[in-house]
A protein has these predicted regions:
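The feature captures the beta-strand-to-loop junction immediately N-terminal to the Walker
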Residues: 34-36
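Helix-to-loop junction immediately C-terminal to a conserved catalytic motif
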Residues: 49
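Conserved ABC transporter NBD signature motif
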Residues: 57-70
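Conserved ABC ATPase "signature" region
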Residues: 94, 98, 106-123
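Catalytic Walker B motif of ABC-type/P-loop ATPase nucleotide-binding domains
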Residues: 152-155
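Helix N-cap at the start of a conserved alpha-helix in ABC-type nucleotide-binding domains
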Residues: 163-165
Length: 203
C-alpha cells in the first residue's frame, strides 16, 4: 500500500471532525472520499498532506512514516484557490513548482510538456487575474501533476469546471491512474466517483 492513514482523529474546539478514520491507496488505484459539507473530507486530505496535524493516528508512505521528503512525491490540488492574481500564469506555475524543490529549468520543462495536455497552449504570459474559476482550476491541477507525483490528492477537482473541462480532467485522471499514480479525490459528484474510482470511503 503506497499510502496508509490509520485511526485518524481530529477535533477543532468542541467539534470532533474526524473520529478513528482509515484511508489507504495503492499505486494505480483511485479512491473517492465522499461525504456532505462538514464531514471532514478537506481536513482529512490536509492531514494526509501534512498541512494539519492529527490529534491521533499514523500516516505511512510506502511503508514508512510520511515525512517532508516524501511530500515531493505527492501532488495536492486544494479546494480553495491559492493563486497570486498579479503574476502571469507561467511565472506563477514556476514559483509553485520551485516550492516543491525543482530547479527552474526542470520545472519549466515539466510545465511546458504538460500544458498542451490540459488545453493550456498560449497561457504562459496570461495574467492570472484574467483567468476564470475553471481556468484557475486547470492551472492548479497543472502544478499538482507536472512533477509526476506517485500520489495525487484532489479536493473537489471538478469544482468550477464546465463540461469540456470536466471531460479533460476525467481523461487526465484516468491516464495518470493507468500509469500507476495513486489518486485520492473528494467529490460531491457521485457519477464522477463511480466512473473514475474503484474504491470509496464514506465520511
Amino acid at each position: 500500500m503506497l499510502l496508509q492513514a490509520e485511526h485518524i482523529s481530529k477535533t477543532f474546539g468542541a467539534k470532533r471532525v474526524l473520529d478513528d478514520v482509515n484511508l489507504g491507496a495503492d499505486s494505480g488505484q483511485c479512491v473517492a472520499l465522499l461525504g456532505g459539507n462538514g464531514a471532514g473530507k478537506t481536513t482529512l486530505l490536509r492531514i494526509v498532506t501534512r498541512l494539519v496535524e492529527p490529534d491521533s493516528g499514523s500516516i505511512l508512505f510506502d511503508g514508512h512514516p510520511l515525512g517532508q521528503a516524501d511530500l515531493r512525491q505527492v501532488g495536492y490540488l486544494p479546494e480553495e484557490r491559492g493563486l497570486y492574481r498579479n503574476m502571469r500564469v507561467g511565472e506563477q506555475a514556476l514559483y509553485l513548482m520551485r516550492l516543491k524543490g525543482l530547479g527552474r529549468r526542470e520545472a519549466e520543462a515539466a510545465l511546458r510538456s504538460w500544458m498542451p495536455r490540459l488545453g493550456m497552449d498560449g497561457w504562459w504570459q496570461l495574467p492570472t487575474r484574467r483567468l476564470s474559476k475553471g481556468m484557475q482550476q486547470r492551472l492548479q491541477f497543472l502544478v499538482s501533476v507536472a512533477h509526476n507525483p506517485r500520489l495525487l490528492i484532489l479536493d473537489e477537482p471538478f469544482s468550477g469546471l464546465d463540461a469540456d473541462g470536466a471531460a479533460m480532467l476525467t481523461a487526465q485522471i484516468q491516464s495518470l491512474r493507468a500509469s500507476g499514480t495513486a489518486i485520492i479525490l473528494s467529490t460531491h459528484n457521485l457519477q464522477a466517483a463511480s466512473a473514475l474510482c474503484d474504491k470509496t470511503v464514506q465520511l
